[in-house]
Amino acid sequence: MKRFPMFLRTAAALALAASLAGCGAMNAQNPSSALQPVNAVPDETDSRLFLKGADVVAYFTQKQYVQGSPQFKSSHEGVTFRFASAANKALFDQAPASYLPQYGGYCANGIAYGIPWGGDADTWKMIDGKLYIFGGQASREAFELDVAGNLRLAEKYWAEEVKGSNSFWQRSKRLVFKVPHYKTGEELAAQVAAAKARP
């Protein structure tokens, strides 16, 4: 019997490990609910923790990112939300939809490209009373180059492709089959730098 070369066995083992390592996150981000897909991760106590435990109410009431506590949490559509206080939990429980970030808490700039990238809870923006999360400062700045245009694109791709889909497969599809307006991170960074350089 012919043996597989070492590099093939190593590659197969790495592929298997990578696929198994992603199962927890893949399951957490794709609950069987109206929130699918959602920016959630498993942790020690919760299998689908939204935005790594950021208090979604605090963005509206305190106008800042605040980390929630496991002491104050609610479940909505199969996803766990944490809050910094009992008061914030009560506000959420009265009207959860009022406090949910757009696009399941994924990076709004990524959604404009049809790609559900994880959002960074401390990089956010309120636009017309709605909460948008971004993957980092560079992503937010790129989105702000054309807020109206990027919102139109994000709404289109969220409605037509991302909402209700499996985040992993959608991300994989759009990383291979890019949208017509796709720009690399370097191209976006150059546009942001040029915009900042203008008087």
Model-derived segments and spans:
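Short, well-structured hydrophobic secondary-structure segments
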Residues: 78-85
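Short, solvent-exposed recognition patches
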Residues: 85-100
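Intrinsically disordered, low-complexity terminal tails and linkers in eukaryotic proteins, enriched
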Residues: 24-77, 98-199
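Structured alpha-helical
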Residues: 16
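Bacterial N-terminal signal peptides that target proteins for export
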Residues: 2-12
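C-terminal motif of bacterial Sec signal peptides marking the signal peptidase cleavage site
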Residues: 19-22
